[in-house]
Amino acid sequence: SCGYPCSHCGIPGCYPG
C-alpha cells in the first residue's frame, strides 16, 4: 500500500492504505 490513491502513486497494482 502507498498511503495515497494509485493515480498519485505511479506504481501499477498499488492501492490506498
Curated annotation (Swiss-Prot):
Its main location: secreted. Contains 2 disulfide bonds. It is found in: Secreted. The keyword Disulfide bond applies. GO terms for molecular function: toxin activity. Keywords: Amidation, Disulfide bond, Neurotoxin, Secreted, Toxin. GO terms for cellular component: extracellular region. The cysteine framework is XIV (C-C-C-C). Negative results: does not show effect on Kv1.1, Kv1.2, Kv1.3, Kv1.4, Kv1.5, and Kv1.6. Does not show effect on muscular (alpha-1-beta-1-delta-epsilon) and neuronal alpha-7, alpha-4-beta-4, and alpha-3-beta-4 nAChRs. This is Conotoxin Asi14a.
